[in-house]
Swiss-Prot record:
Belongs to the pseudouridine synthase TruB family. PROSITE patterns: PUA. It comes from Schizosaccharomyces pombe (strain 972 / ATCC 24843). The keyword Isomerase applies. GO terms for molecular function: box H/ACA snoRNA binding; pseudouridine synthase activity; rRNA binding; snRNA pseudouridine synthase activity. Sequence repeats lie at residues 443-445, 450-452, 454-456, 457-459, 460-462, 463-465, 466-468. This is H/ACA ribonucleoprotein complex subunit cbf5. One of its GO terms (cellular component) is cytosol. Component of the small nucleolar ribonucleoprotein particles containing H/ACA-type snoRNAs (H/ACA snoRNPs). Keywords: Isomerase, Nucleus, Repeat, Ribonucleoprotein, Ribosome biogenesis, RNA-binding, rRNA processing. Its EC number is 5.4.99.-. The lineage of its organism: Eukaryota, Fungi, Dikarya, Ascomycota, Taphrinomycotina.
């Protein structure tokens, strides 16, 4: 990927309406075919922060990378992950789903920041190639093929006898399966299966043996796909990882290490994308919802409550989010929440803070200073009527535009004065009572501290006396 276009700066530029010099179908990772995304606006101010995923500094590249590892037979998944952690000298590592010690194949290992995506990878679908040993000969290959195809859809499974989890009946889905090869003389069958995460292939082999009426068990197993990465997507061995780190340590050549490790964005290629303005990136990293003004481009076919990925103009993944608007709404609305964050991926303060600089935010700050809003920005008795009518708090799910107050006939000035006087006296009383409560609480706290200090002094004296008595007795 890195050698495809060495001189090209992979970035969505402002007002990029004309076609790019190179075909965007060849652009890497999350920027692939970005010109086919629907455009909300082409105007934004680029901020010289962050890097394209393929051009990150090597330390950052390793700590936000994933490895598509070909797990060797015999060591457990946890041992392999611990070895990778030790070789690369990273703080954290995680994997995409446990493989039994004797099983080989795809094991996606996530480093440091990429471990935030481990949960989504563990729940992703898997594909296996399995060798089934039958306990007796079967009449024909067709019977085996039909039995394998019969065991598709939702199946009841109980974990095998040798398992680390409770042997509880569970339902798992087999999406597709097909026979690859059958040897009747040796009673061996090789088949491929695409299944849900958490499916026990060992149990499936036992069920196939029962279905054929001869019994059977799993002879050998290999995982050929985990989530969006398969064994054809630059799979590497433990020796490759060790050699790449050795070459970098001794020759400072990082090219081999960059080929072994791939950016975390490669795990998010299957998600629908929403491109965010640079000025809105850090707010999302702090947990804010993405609003319409921060939106640049979006994918067609987004549905409400669908999982999407929020990306920067340089193709970096900011967060995995949940869409709050469909594609149709995004094209027509001029305000509202686009998506809320499910799992933040980017570190905070990679991009500068840009929130609180708009006209509405500045007005809100001045009202807070003048005491016309409370410290949380909520209206109080001093809040101007025009502010409460016009301002909508999107953090409040029940927030609506305030309706204008009904017109009331002006009352006599004497009555108004009396009402104001009563309200003022009530306010004074409430303030005085709260001050008294605070004073009483402070006095109680002082008394408690004095008592504790006296107790400590007594205990110290008693200890000293005991020590002196012991010395005298000796």
């Amino acid at each position: 990927m890195t050698d495809t276009h060495p001189g090209v700066d992979f970035m969505i530029k402002p007002e990029a309406t004309s076609a790019s010099k190179i075909d965007t179908a060849e652009w890497p990772l999350l920027l692939k075919n970005f010109d086919k995304l629907l455009v909300r606006t082409g105007h934004y101010t680029p901020i010289p922060c962050g890097n394209n995923p393929l051009k990150r500094p090597i330390a950052e590249y390793v700590s936000s990378g994933v490895i598509n590892l070909d797990k060797p037979a015999n060591p457990s998944s946890h041992e392999v992950v611990a070895w990778v952690k030790k070789i690369l000298r990273v703080e954290k590592t995680g994997h995409s789903g446990t493989l039994d010690p004797k099983v080989t194949g795809c094991l996606i290992i996530c480093n440091d920041r990429a471990t935030r995506l481990v949960k989504s990878q563990q729940s992703a679908g898997k594909e296996y190639v399995c060798v089934l040993r039958l306990h007796d000969s079967v009449e024909g290959e067709r019977n085996v093929a039909s039995a394998i195809e019969t065991l598709t859809g939702a199946l009841f499974q109980r974990p095998p006898l040798i398992s680390a989890v409770k042997r509880q009946l569970r339902i798992r889905s087999i999406y597709e399966s097909k026979l690859i090869e059958f040897d009747n003389e040796r009673n061996l069958a090789v088949f491929w299966a695409s299944c849900e995460a958490g499916t026990y292939m060992r149990t499936l082999c036992v069920h196939l043996g029962l279905l054929l009426g001869v019994g059977g068990h799993m002879q050998e197993l290999r995982r050929v796909r985990s989530g969006c990465l398969s064994e054809n997507d630059d799979i590497v061995t433990m020796h490759d990882v060790l050699d790449a780190q050795w070459i970098y340590d001794n020759t400072r050549d990082e090219s081999y290490l960059r080929r072994v490790i791939r950016p975390l964005e490669s795990l998010l290629v299957g998600y629908k994308r929403i491109v965010v303005k640079d000025s809105a990136v850090n707010a999302i990293c702090y947990g804010a919802k993405l609003m319409i003004p921060g939106l640049l481009r979006y994918e067609a076919g987004i549905e409400v409550n669908e999982e999407i990925v929020l990306i920067t103009t340089k193709g970096e993944a900011i967060a995995v989010g949940i869409a709050q608007m469909s594609t149709v709404e995004l094209s027509t609305c001029d305000h509202g929440v686009v998506a809320k964050v499910k799992r933040c991926i980017m570190e905070r303060d990679v991009y500068p803070r840009r929130w609180g600089l708009g006209p509405q935010s500045m007005k809100k700050k001045t009202l807070k200073k003048e005491g016309k809003l409370d410290k949380y920005g909520r209206p109080n008795e001093n809040t101007p009527a025009d502010w409460s009518k016009s301002y909508i708090d999107y953090s409040d799910p029940n927030a609506e535009v305030a309706k204008p107050a009904p017109v009331v006939a002006p009352a006599a000035p004497t009555v108004e004065a009396e009402v104001n006087g009563v309200e003022d006296s009530k306010k004074r009383k409430s303030v005085e009572s709260s001050e008294k409560d605070e004073d009483e609480a402070a006095k109680k706290e002082e008394k408690r501290r004095k008592k504790e200090a006296k107790k400590e002094k007594k205990e110290k004296k008693e200890k000293k006396e005991k020590k002196e008595k012991k010395k005298k007795s000796e």
